[in-house]
Amino acid sequence: MTHMSIFLSRDNKVIVQGITGSEATVHTARMLRAGTQIVGGVNARKAGTTVTHEDKGGRLIKLPVFGSVAEAMEKTGADVSIIFVPPTFAKDAIIEAIDAEIPLLVVITEGIPVQDTAYAWAYNLEAGHKTRIIGPNCPGIISPGQSLAGITPANITGPGPIGLVSKSGTLTYQMMFELRDLGFSTAIGIGGDPVIGTTHIDAIEAFERDPDTKLIVMIGEIGGDAEERAADFIKTNVSKPVVGYVAGFTAPEGKTMGHAGAIVSGSSGTAAAKQEALEAAGVKVGKTPSATAALAREILLSL
C-alpha cells in the first residue's frame, strides 16, 4: 500500500547544499539510510568532485558535487534541496536555490540573522513564490517509510494516519515516539525563528487535503501569534480532528526561551492565550506533551 504524505515523498530527488561539511556528511548518510533519494550536492569550491556514501542497501555510491543548485537540478532532476551551510553563507545559499526555482527548500541552519531570512523570503515572494521553504532553524520534514529531508531520527516510527507540524524539533521527536505504534503521514518541524517559510497553517491546510492523514497534531510555543492565526484558520477550514500543545506555560514575561521567536510581551503570546484560541476553534489542547499524545491516541482510536 502506498501511503500519501505532504510536501515530500519517496519520489523526490534531493540535493544537499554544503554536502561536504561535517554536519551535512553525517546527515546525508542518515538520510540515505532512511531511503531518501539523494542525487548529489552543491559546493562551488569542490565542484566536479564526488562524495562517497552508503545507500540504503549498504552499497557504496558516489554522489556528484556541483558548482550550483541550477547545475545540480539540470543534471539530476532534483526537486528538493537541503541547506546545511553556516549562518553567514545561508542567505546566499537560499537565494541561489530560489533563483534555480527548486520546488522545496529545507533550511536546517540555526542562527541565521532574522534580517537575512526576511530578505530571502521577500526575494522569494518577488520571484513568484515558486519555492516552498521549510525553516530555518528546524529539523526539516519526514514522511516515514518514504523520505527524510532533514535531521529527524528516521527510526522512531513508520507510516500512519497522523500529520504533525511543530515549532520545536525535540517535541517533534517526542510526539513521534509517544505515538510510534500509530505512525505518521508526514512530520514537519517548521522552526522556532521569528520569520519562517512554512507556517502551521500551510501544513494544516495540506494535511486537511491529504487523504491518508486522519488526525492533525500541532505543536506551538509562546511568542508571536502563529497559533492564534492557526486557530482562526482551523475554525473555518479544517474538518479533521486537531490536537494541540503549546510549549512555555511557565515562561516569565520578556525573556527569550530557547528560540528567538519564543518571547512573551504582556498578555500577548502567552501559552494560556494560545490555548484559549485553539480550544475556541475546537482543538483539543494537552497540558503536557504526553497528555497531548494521549488525547491524539484517544481521538484517533474513536474515529
Curated annotation (Swiss-Prot):
GO terms for biological process: tricarboxylic acid cycle. GO terms for molecular function: nucleotide binding; succinate-CoA ligase (ADP-forming) activity; succinate-CoA ligase (GDP-forming) activity. It comes from the Bacteria. InterPro entries: Cit_synth/succinyl-CoA_lig_AS (IPR017440), Citrt_syn/SCS-alpha_CS (IPR033847), CoA-bd (IPR003781), CoA_lig_alpha (IPR005810), NAD(P)-bd_dom_sf (IPR036291), SUCC_ACL_C (IPR005811), Succinyl-CoA_synth-like (IPR016102). This is Succinate--CoA ligase [ADP-forming] subunit alpha. Succinyl-CoA synthetase functions in the citric acid cycle (TCA), coupling the hydrolysis of succinyl-CoA to the synthesis of either ATP or GTP and thus represents the only step of substrate-level phosphorylation in the TCA. The alpha subunit of the enzyme binds the substrates coenzyme A and phosphate, while succinate binding and nucleotide specificity is provided by the beta subunit. It catalyses: succinate + ATP + CoA = succinyl-CoA + ADP + phosphate; GTP + succinate + CoA = succinyl-CoA + GDP + phosphate. PANTHER family: SUCCINATE--COA LIGASE [ADP_GDP-FORMING] SUBUNIT ALPHA, MITOCHONDRIAL, SUCCINYL-COA LIGASE SUBUNIT ALPHA. Pathway: Carbohydrate metabolism; tricarboxylic acid cycle; succinate from succinyl-CoA (ligase route): step 1/1. Heterotetramer of two alpha and two beta subunits. NCBIfam families: PRK05678.1, sucCoAalpha. Its EC number is 6.2.1.5. One of its GO terms (cellular component) is peptidoglycan-based cell wall. The keyword Metal-binding does not apply. Belongs to the succinate/malate CoA ligase alpha subunit family. The active site is at residue 259. It comes from Mycobacterium tuberculosis (strain ATCC 25618 / H37Rv). The keyword Nucleotide-binding applies. Transmembrane segments: none annotated. Substrate binds at residue 173. The lineage of its organism: Bacteria, Bacillati, Actinomycetota, Actinomycetes, Mycobacteriales. CoA binds at residues 20-23, 46, 108-110. Keywords: Ligase, Nucleotide-binding, Tricarboxylic acid cycle.
